[in-house]
Amino acid sequence: MKKLLINTFLFSFLSLNIEANEALFIKYADKSINSSSLVERQGLKYQVNTNSPFSGRFITYEDEFGFCAKEAGSYRRGLLHGPYEEYAGCGILYSIKSSYKNGLEHGTYSEFDEGFLIMEGNMFNGMAEGEWVGYEYGRISWTEDVKNDETISFTNYSYYDNGQISTKDVYNNNEELHGISEAYHQNGQLKSKTEYQNGTLVRLIEEYDFNGNRLN
């Protein structure tokens, strides 16, 4: 009896924490199959004892009782297609939110660590594309300009202990400083702008003191 009450409490707790965000495993609960009933043949998913590629929604569970959701999504003709999510902590927290088109990741991709967003960007036919952003402690840690799954350039951010941005440095795909680097005083005032090209200092563009008075 005690175990039943604990399980009931946990299920209610999970529902309250996830439902506001409409997690797929909650929306799909009554209209999906357990992915344990799917098998793969030549790269396509089939339900056991069937000959047609599976189309429909699925939920994968960590446990044999179907209590802790691990992932949820849908297949179309045996390939992942549509919204897709992975979970941590028995479904309490998001791990990945993405989407697929004909078996390839396509659309917005978000990745989480212990429920906190750590990376987001866009996928196009299975390849990263456009601007990607990384986060740490809720602040932007880096950005990347990506084309056809390859990094063209990236920017690193550093911060003072008070949360104010300290530096913003731009790098090329060889990890060399390239472009305009910015530094800031602890009060948020711009300290300097410096131009680099392929790792070589080109010029000091601007420099300011703590109060915003130009020094060059």
Where are these regions (language model features)?
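Sec-dependent N-terminal signal peptides
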Residues: L4-L14
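Glycine/tyrosine- and acidic-biased, solvent-exposed loop/turn segments at the edges of beta-strands
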Residues: L16-N216
